[in-house]
Regions:
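Catalytic cores of enzyme domains
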Residues: 99, 106, 115-329
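Iron-sulfur (Fe-S) cluster-binding modules
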Residues: 1-119, 129-134, 306, 310-334
Length: 334
């Protein structure tokens, strides 16, 4: 069945930013993100970091203001910013075998709102410049969107369903990551939570990919084999001994190379057709200078992840089967 057109979505190529919005994009974000750089480096603080750490603070404030105009959005995001208190690590350490600790972490996270759990060894280039993370491991939590609510994006003063679901998943990420960090601390280990939507020390998508939660999509977001692009992420770094989960290849990257759905759905035309070199890695990249003005005006947008074929519950199983056949097997561990 064909889905009805969303009246809040302008067609690609028909949208231009308001003059006052365009005036706030005083610098290009693409060089700051490392587009065209051939050598790996740590990412620079960027959108959703404190506004004094990057040149786009005014646009960030406009994005938040427009988001909060949507019905229910303020309450949804207030829950995301309701950070529980962190306890001090216990003086008594749980010395169970690494296999048992890994199972305990996974079971605790899944019992406390996380929909998927992955574990990776920390990499220096996952930490933003100016920040420090000393812990050797990162646990990444995936929080799945409600598809029927997500497909309502973008939101505005008449309909806040989509952006409220974004806020709700970030709130689950806050609770889940803080609860897990406190549980790990209760076992005698160090642990720090890193939920969204505000950015902190930890870049979340690369460790999510390394931990087997998905692949990077053409739209610059994670594609999960279980939930498609309809996920939000939170992280917990720790010194607890844990067994890493392995990256998984299930065909999203190959599919994105030929798919044009998100490219055609993006009103400002920000999704590029080919991979680019970004901080020494050839990868999918979204043009920040085109994306963010629309993102700011459209209450945080979300069109690309809602329109992604992998996000549609009725389509995703067929894609998994088709791509597994093309790859010569099922989900693979690399």
């Amino acid at each position: 069945m064909t889905q009805p057109a969303n009246p809040r979505r302008p067609k690609r190529g028909t949208w231009t930013p308001q003059p006052e919005t365009a005036a706030l994009l005083r610098d290009s974000g693409n060089p700051i993100n490392g587009v065209g750089e051939n050598f790996p480096r740590r990412p620079s603080p960027f959108f959703w970091h404190p506004t004094d750490q990057h040149p786009f603070g005014d646009l960030q404030l406009i994005a938040r203001k427009n988001s909060r105009k949507c019905p229910g959005s303020t309450e949804a995001f207030q829950a995301a910013y309701a950070y529980p208190e962190l306890i001090e690590p216990s003086a008594e350490r749980n010395e169970a075998p690494i296999e048992a600790l890994t199972a305990l972490v996974r079971d605790f996270a899944l019992a406390h709102e996380a929909d998927e759990v992955g574990i990776a060894l920390m990499e220096p280039n996952w930490v933003f410049e100016g920040y420090t993370i000393e812990h050797p491991r990162v646990i990444v939590l995936a929080l799945a969107h409600n598809y029927e609510r997500l497909r309502e994006v973008p939101s505005d003063e008449t309909n806040g369903i989509g952006v409220c679901d974004v806020g709700d998943q970030y709130a689950r990420g806050t609770r889940s990551s803080y609860n897990l960090a406190n549980w790990i601390r209760s076992q005698g280990y160090q642990a720090d939570p890193y939920p969204g939507p505000m950015a902190g020390a930890l870049l979340l998508i690369p460790p999510a990919i390394a931990a087997g939660l998905g692949e990077l999509g053409k739209h610059g977001s994670l594609i999960s084999p279980r939930y498609g692009s309809g996920v939000r992420l939170a992280g917990v770094t720790t010194d607890m001994p844990l067994i890493p989960t392995m990256p998984r290849r299930f065909g999203a990257d190959e599919f994105c190379a030929n798919c044009q759905v998100c490219t055609q759905a993006c009103p400002p035309g920000a999704i590029t057709p080919r991979k680019q070199m970004v901080r020494g890695v050839e990868r999918w990249y979204v043009d920040f200078d085109k994306c963010i003005p629309y993102f700011a005006e459209a209450a945080s947008c979300g069109i690309c992840i809602a329109e992604c074929p992998w996000t549609r519950p009725s389509v995703r199983p067929k894609l998994l089967t088709t791509m597994a056949r093309k790859l010569g097997g099922g989900l693979s561990q690399e």
